[in-house]
Amino acid sequence: MNLSRRDFMKANAAMAAATAAGLSIPVKNVEAAESEIKWDKAVCRFCGTGCAVLVGTKDGRVVASQGDPDAEVNRGLNCIKGYFLPKIMYGKDRLTQPMLRMKDGKYDKNGDFTPVSWDVAFKTMAEKFKAAVKELGPNGVGMFSSGQTTIFEGYAKSKLWKAGFRSNNIDPNARHCMASAAVAFMRTFGMDEPMGCYNDIEQAEAFVLWGSNMAEMHPILWSRITDRRLSNQDVKVAVLSTFEHRSFELADYSLIFKPHTDLVILNYIINYLIQNDAINRDFVNKHTKFKRGETDIGYGLRPENPLEQKAKNVKTAGKMYDSNFDELKALVAEYTLDKAHEMSGVPKDVLENLAKLYADPKKKVVSYWTMGFNQHTRGVWANHLIYNIHLLTGKISIPGCGPFSLTGQPSACGTAREVGTFIHRLPADLVVTNPKHREKAEQIWKLPAGVITDVLGFHAVAQSRALKDGKMRVLWQMCTNNMQGGPNINRETFPGWRNPDNFIVVSDPYPTVSCLAADLMLPTAMWVEKEGAYGNAERRTQFWRQQVKAPGEAKSDVWQLVEFSKYFTTDEMWPAEILDKNPEYKGKTLYDVLYRNGQVDKFPLSELAEGQLNDESYHFGFYLQKGLFEEYASFGRGHGHDLASFDTYHKARGLRWPVVDGKETLWRYREGYDPYVKEGEGVAFYGYPDKKAIILAVPYEPPAESPDEEYDLWLCTGRVLEHWHTGTMTRRVPELHRSFPNNLVWMHPTDAQKRGLRHGDKVKVASRRGEIISFLDTRGRNKVPEGLIYTTFFDAGQLANKLTLDATDPISKETDFKKCAVKVEKAA
């Protein structure tokens, strides 16, 4: 029997599936067993790496999965979560029909969840939506979604909200994780997302991790970095964090710094570059310009908070002023080696070695960061400072060099950022506050002038406050779990959700904490139960086809959005003055205007592949996903956001945009790699008209909350390898649940001894906002310094975000989950 590598891996997957099911297959029968399984490509459902998988289906179920050997991202590998992908779909408590709180046969906020039809669910929703808009205007209704919905779903929801409801009150949970990176990209380069790609890994000579535990959070990329490090003795790895985690095992330089002092370290490096004449002056003079940022900008707390009252420049937090190199030099001069050591606690020699990595003109350096950088009340500044370092040294937009923000969700880039599901964004980096951008969107969407408004909605944290304060009445949460994942849930989120005047809808495959706090649960198709597309951290867009049907009456998010649009007319949602000027739109449903506009419904069912499942398209009578994508792609073609044709992505293992003349772009802004850089330009940061990037001078400013006598410990929250976010999927995989069944609190042994605590003790962790009961770990994988504890938020039985502070970066509005003050004592 001769098997190709691909066939061998498929057979391996068949064996794995049988083993997981408790079956034993003789080796000679493996190929026969595999032949009964239908295989197709898909994208992993978890992090933003974008690993490709082969999915095996049989008898209408997903029975196996395997890393795709033809995929450049992961090259046939999966992490522990990826290996168990099939099992995320078959938890015993899958939601299979809409469930509405009812009493005596009608909706009641305090009623019991009762099965209803989709029509009853949508009629109830529509009634609440219309009442909220009548009372409070378009921003009386809100959508909170995620970077886990597909590109098609993100586009459909953004269009329904911004055009149909004329409301910009739509935000993703990427606000909690990627907003600071996106804002800093836009401010620095005039365009979002990294200029490099994963190919940098095999060419870099130094890797610097800023607040990123890639070993557990991006393990496939970490395996590539490990291979690079161990195969070349000249390659170095530096890891910076407030505690020691598994990524430190590979580190040549370990930097454990005091919370929030990464700003000091970054400015020290810039000072070192200047003092040691390590500036690439030719690059800086040709390709950059200098600005200084506004300071004393507050912490994104409620306006009445003393910290906000005290801050001088809350209203101008994002302002940048013209500056020059000398002003930057003067600002960073105080960040000496002595000061950086004193404030951060990092040994001087280690700080200096890190600075030398960046200063060495012959050393190719890639900087990676995730939530440790972004979930930060000065996260935008932190992002700017790392861009400063790469711009000052010219180590950017070339193979093996560059700043690289890693995403945590599979389509935080593709859906949240590129599609534009933030309150201020439209597709392809357009924004609702720009009249020309609104006009372009209205033209593409075939809308009358003035339909899209410039009034911003409530960002993620502000949505919770608005519900609590009665400034918003309806929230539709889709494909996320904010009642567990959001900050300060006891004081800010829960009160608004259970406010009797508010109506909360949650679309999810499982009965999450959010579902149980809601008024209506909508059962959702997940992963390969629908046709989908994700955009990963390296600008790679990847497609998959529907491979099985969803259970019961569960429907995909895109079906829910498009079907729901039928319950509204333009007369109900648009002002009379617009309709009077454009009478041809009167009386039409939002479905007719948005999705039957001659573009979204352009492609007939005959364009579906023979035998292809596509429940949404067969329901609506046209190839919905293709129509949505081609209309969406028209926003970006011709100005640096080019996407390939829809059909191309079904054939490829993903392509990195901009895709021009069928060719993807690996490194943006560099001549010879980027088709938008003209011959002779060398480098062109074409997001700005002058094609220059911004170097921003900003200082250190303290955190919003620090330990004191009563709350004497720092709290940092995050994840572990085995679980993903709030555990909605991974805790329903028996193997993953057994490997890490509940949340822990990691503490330094000395801190434990001071409190009379021992490893394994049940402890109470309390902040000014709430408390949880957990279990102490003083010996495990995470080794924290004295004065700090680390915990995770995957455990619905502990709800760690009762502790966290709802402080945000005042510019990006991203939440700081990494720093607040707590106390720990033995639980009764």
UniProtKB/Swiss-Prot annotation:
Transmembrane segments: none annotated. [4Fe-4S] cluster binds at C44, C47, C51, C79. Binds 1 [4Fe-4S] cluster. Keywords: 4Fe-4S, Electron transport, Iron, Iron-sulfur, Metal-binding, Molybdenum, Nitrate assimilation, Oxidoreductase, Periplasm, Signal, Transport. Its EC number is 1.9.6.1. The keyword Iron-sulfur applies. Mo-bis(molybdopterin guanine dinucleotide) binds at residues 81, 148, 173, 177, 210-217, 241-245, 371, 375, 481, 507-508, 530, 557, 717-726, 801, 818. One of its GO terms (cellular component) is periplasmic space. It comes from the Bacteria. Predicted to be exported by the Tat system. The position of the signal peptide cleavage has not been experimentally proven. GO terms for molecular function: 4 iron, 4 sulfur cluster binding; electron transfer activity; iron ion binding; molybdenum ion binding; molybdopterin cofactor binding; nitrate reductase (cytochrome) activity. Substrate binds at F793. It is an enzyme of class 1 (oxidoreductase). It is found in: Periplasm. It catalyses: 2 Fe(II)-[cytochrome] + nitrate + 2 H(+) = 2 Fe(III)-[cytochrome] + nitrite + H2O. This is Periplasmic nitrate reductase. It comes from Aggregatibacter actinomycetemcomitans.
